[in-house]
């Protein structure tokens, strides 16, 4: 009886190791971004808006008074 229990116990451990290894593998895979990611042109838009804001601030602070 003990041999059967030991064999089933090691099988259970192997099954658990296999499932945890499968979970570990799925967690290590890179996550692909979907369609809701940030578009590439938004960085350029942010840069241009920053430059325009700086120019407007320069005009109001230094040239108008």
UniProtKB/Swiss-Prot annotation:
Modification Phosphoserine occurs at: 19, 26
Entry GO CC: endoplasmic reticulum membrane
Chief location category: endoplasmic reticulum
Transmembrane segments: 44-64
Domain of life: Eukaryota
Membrane topology: Single-pass membrane protein
Protein name: Sarcoplasmic/endoplasmic reticulum calcium ATPase regulator ARLN
Species whose genome carries this gene: Rattus norvegicus (Rat)
């Amino acid at each position: 009886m003990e041999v059967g229990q030991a064999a089933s116990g090691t099988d259970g451990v192997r099954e658990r190791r296999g499932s945890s290894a499968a979970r570990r593998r799925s967690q290590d895979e890179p996550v692909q971004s979907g369609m809701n990611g940030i578009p590439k042109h938004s960085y350029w838009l942010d840069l241009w808006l920053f430059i325009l804001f700086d120019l407007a601030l320069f005009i109001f602070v230094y040239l108008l008074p």
